[in-house]
Each structure stands twice: as C-alpha cells, then as structure tokens.
Amino acid sequence: MLGTYFYHEIIRKTIISFGTLFNNINIKHKKSDGTILDDIKVGLSYGPQQKYLAKIQEQANLTKAVAITLPRMSFEMNSIQYDPSRKTGVTQTFKAADGTKMKKVYMPVPYNIGFELSIFSKLNDDALQIIEQIMPYFQPSFTLTVDLVSAIGEKRDIPVVLDNISFQDDYEGKIGRAHV
C-alpha cells in the first residue's frame, strides 16, 4: 500500500540508547561513621512498572528464592507523538554517501518518543541516591548521539528531556509487610 519495504530499527535503537543512559548506577549503604557496607549495582530492564510490582508483591514469603533484587529500575516506551514544530518540507531531501555512490534521502519525520523510568527500592534512601545520580545530567535535557541509519551513516543528536519526577509509596497493607 505505502511503498517499498524498509526497516532501519530507528525506534529500537532509540529505546536501547535511552536504556543505556541508566546502565551504570550504583548505590552505597554506609555505617554511621561513613564506612561503606555495600556497593550495589542497580539492575535495569525493559518492561512495564506493573509487571515488576506484581513480581515483587508475589514475594510475600521472604524465605522463597529471590526472583527480583531491589533496588531495581525498569523503563518502557509509553508514547510516540508527532512534533509539527520540527516539520520540514515533505519533498526536501539530502544526499548521503554509502561508500560507493550518492543516495537521495528524504528528510526524517519528526516524532517525540516518550519513556517512563521506574525505580523500585526497599529503602527511601536507595531511591534518593538513584535520583540524585540521574538529575544533574538533565538540565532539562541530555543529548545522545545515535547512529540511526547505518546504511547512509546518519547520526543524529537526540535530546532526552526529563519532564518530571513523581513519587509513589504504598503505605497500605499489613504491618510488617515490605513496602516498595
């Protein structure tokens, strides 16, 4: 219907690039004198927040084998929105070399891809340590350079904008039950 098949994995590469931002986050547990007890790498995976909350809540019996360790982060793509403010002419093209010949390439269509990053922790201080390691890089955006279309060598600087941070703590439930 629309034309010739193509798949440059642009959305996939964008998702991977977003996740890579949060790969190397650690937290530390310290004694009151400042001595480090634990240096913990925070796990990261792609998937919806509700999936991880359900898994964590299934672990009510603490003697069971560990299925998810906390703290942990998950992220997911939650929207794709057209951005008319970045629109260029429909027929505008640019030339790109693929090593042997020049190719005529149409301008990309501007879309904003929304993500949600969720942080799960047993201790409030763990969550605050994670947030404090993320916030300074976003003022309010952080720019990633992504190799979007390898066939033509198209690399783009993609700004990742931190819109807001919201907190959710489940205070409901039985006394003695772990809260996430």
Question: Whereabouts are the PLM-identified features?
Answer:
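Acidic-leaning, charged glycine-interspersed low-complexity segments
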Residues: 107-109, 129, 136-179
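Active-site-proximal segments of catalytic enzyme domains
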Residues: 87-90, 95-105, 110
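Oligomerization/assembly interface segments of phage tail-like spikes and tubes
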Residues: 71-79, 107-123, 132-134, 176-179
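Small/polar-rich, solvent-exposed N-terminal microdomains that initiate assembly or binding
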Residues: 1-92
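Short, charged/polar micro-motifs that form catalytic or ligand-binding hotspots
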Residues: 1-8, 116-125
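Catalytic micro-motifs at enzyme active sites that drive phosphoryl/nucleotidyl and oxygen chemistry
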Residues: 60-65, 99-107, 169-174
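Short, solvent-exposed secondary-structure capping/transition elements
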Residues: 83-86, 124-131, 143-147
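Short, well-ordered alpha-helical segments
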Residues: 13, 17, 126-137
